[in-house]
Each structure stands twice: as structure tokens, then as C-alpha cells.
């Protein structure tokens, strides 16, 4: 089924599923997926997971074709233990598995970490865990990023709060 203005095809619904635009009939170019939903962000670690009580775990996503946009807020009411780099697990889709093609995004807000607060989000190809990156010194312009570790988690109530968003391509 096609949709036209005057004599020009603007959109087509393919028999096998998906939409094409502006006269394109190739299935490979069809937009074949559009969805939105929720996901549950959870603090984890690359070496051993900390013991965490989450007070806020909100995650939303929109997926159009292979493009995914996620947003989230995660906050703890208690945290202890664990080891290694602190990550946020539970992404709804893994980024495309292309070597050296990382997804990254800003952190809109972070608070109540013990020493350094995370400033950037980083996701490795084909991974569903978001790394929390901070500057490597107290200089806010220091470009050398270092992962937040489980030792940065505060055990205070309403602590370790992160609000962020991330866009990436998935398979």
C-alpha cells in the first residue's frame, strides 16, 4: 500500500512489514520497529556487586528502527561492599557490536557520592551496563576519564543519585 501526493509516492507499507519513504521499496531500508517502554536501572559492579537498597529506579526508552534513546534516574537509600568499577545495569537493548564504537552521553544530575561524582555515561559495544565516568582529578576540565568505583557509593539515605540519558544504535 502506498501513499502519494500528486504523482509522487511519499510512503509505502511493505507486504513483509515496515515503512519506506519517498519511493524507496527496498526492505533493507524499511522502518520496521517502533516502540517505547520501561527498564529498571540497577547499580552493579564489574568485579563484585555491592549490596544496594534502591529508593528510586526509573527507566524509560524509545526505540525507532535501530536507534534507542534511554533516560533514567537511580538513587539509593543504603549501599555497602562490592568491588571494581560501578555500573548501571539493565539497559533494554545492547549497543551494536562494532569494535571501538562506544555509546556515550551526559549525566544531567548526580549527587551524594563520597568523593567524585560521575559526569559521563559510557557503554561498550554489545554491553547492557552503563559505565559511570568521572574526571581523573579535581580539575573539571581534565579530559582523562576514570570509572567511578563501588568505594564511591555513600551509605547515606537518598544518596548516589544519578539522572541521565543516552542514545545509541542497536542491532
Language-model-detected regions and their locations in the chain:
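Trimeric beta-solenoid/beta-helix "fiber body" segments of extracellular/virion adhesins
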Residues: 1-33, 47, 80-82, 98, ...
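Beta-rich globular "head" domains
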Residues: 54-118, 163-170
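Structured beta-strand segments within beta-sheet-rich domains
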Residues: 113-154
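Extended Gly/Ser/Thr-rich low-complexity repeat segments
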Residues: 5, 82-94, 139-167
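Generic beta-strand structural signal
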Residues: 13, 63, 123-125
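Terminal (often C-terminal
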Residues: 21-65
